[in-house]
A protein has these predicted regions:
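Pre-Walker A segment
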Residues: 20-24
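A short, highly charged nucleic-acid-interacting micro-segment common to nuclease
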Residues: 25-31
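PLP-dependent class I/II
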Residues: 1-18, 31, 35-341
């Protein structure tokens, strides 16, 4: 779907401002304009979450933050990831030299804790026995479309606080949540401000794939080995980043207006109706499927023992449908396939 009308209107207005000396904007503040950070903080407050303006770091997308956040942690930090998983979590740590030795037979890294999420455990990871320094969680989940209840998420928060781990919580798909007992933010959990960083995207809730905007929340209470992570990320952000463009941040501000919220809800309803049709159709055809209720992804078991890539080829050659082979998300993704609504 195209960008919502009220967001386009805000973008046009900001573009016009750039053509006049009295309203021209140059380099943006490193951490984001106050008008957008205030709107973001208010949205958290409306959900009962305590997030201050100076805990919000605006960027040009959640993917960049997913890849860059590891830079403020030690080179020998041990990471834990769900398996299957969004590849950026692992690959960015590989590039940082943090993941050890790769085993081509198992397609795993020696210094990464993998938490299998398969049909057998209802795509729900178990708390790691070995203590990780960083725990990557994504809910609603990419690629499986699974979700986590507040009670279950609280267990992760309690675990992280007990073990001294930091949770990197990717909430890019929170706008697709339709069920009441599913948290939209990890900060809905007691104690999360001392153990969790949250990542958000404007691409998933507002279609900013071609505009690029996202943000990261780091509470001031969050410490790692006695070092506060909020000012550390602020220093890193200011060193390597010049701020998201004024025009795009004004567009992002429009997302939080009543009109913007109404337009975006209609778009999300459109996608989720697609997901419902795909989910219903696949179930009636006898496929084993999950997701598609609180996320725009449908995760299905490949039929007849096909590998993920064999099923990809079959769909492309026989019915002209393109999806994503599950094996691309990690070893536990083999034998699965992701469709997008």
């Amino acid at each position: 779907q195209p960008i919502a009308p009220s967001i386009i209107e805000a973008t046009h207005k900001a573009v016009e401002e750039m053509g006049h000396a009295e309203t021209f904007h140059g380099y943006a503040p490193d951490l984001g304009y106050e008008f957008l950070r205030s709107a973001i903080a208010k949205e958290y407050k409306d959900r009962g979450c305590h997030v201050d303006i100076d805990e919000v770091f605006v960027s040009d997308g959640a993917k960049c933050d997913c890849g860059n956040i590891q830079e403020i942690f030690a080179a020998d930090s041990v990471i834990a990831v769900c398996d299957p998983v969004y590849p950026v979590y692992v690959d960015s740590n590989v590039m940082a030299g943090r993941t050890g030795v790769y085993d081509p037979k198992t397609e795993t890294w020696s210094n990464v804790i993998y938490m299998p999420c398969t049909q057998e455990n209802n795509f729900t990871p178990a708390l790691p026995e070995k203590t990780p320094d960083l725990i990557y969680l994504c809910y609603p989940n990419n690629p499986t479309g699974s979700v986590i209840t507040k009670d279950e998420l609280q267990k992760w928060v309690d675990y992280a606080n007990e073990k001294g781990s930091v949770i990197i919580y990717d909430a890019a798909y929170e706008a697709y949540i339709s069920e009441e007992n599913i948290p939209h933010s990890i900060y809905e959990c007691e104690g999360a401000r001392t153990c969790a960083i949250e990542l958000r995207s404007f691409s998933k809730n507002a279609g900013f794939t071609g505009m690029r905007l996202g943000f990261t929340v780091i509470p001031k209470e969050l410490m790692c080995d006695g070092v506060a992570l909020n000012p550390l990320w602020a220093r890193r952000h200011g060193t390597k980043y010049n701020g998201a463009p004024y025009i795009i941040q004004r567009a992002g501000e429009a997302v939080y207006t009543p009109q913007g919220q109404a337009e975006l809800k209609a778009q999300i309803d459109y996608y989720m109706n697609n997901a419902k049709m795909i989910l219903t159709g696949l179930k009636s055809a006898g496929y084993s499927v999950s997701g598609g209720v609180n996320a725009p992804y449908i995760w299905l078991k490949t039929p007849d023992g096909m590998t993920s890539w064999q099923f990809f080829d079959y769909l492309l050659e026989n019915v002209n449908i393109v999806g994503t082979p599950g094996s691309g998300f990690g070893p536990s993704g083999e034998g699965y396939f992701r469709l997008t609504a």
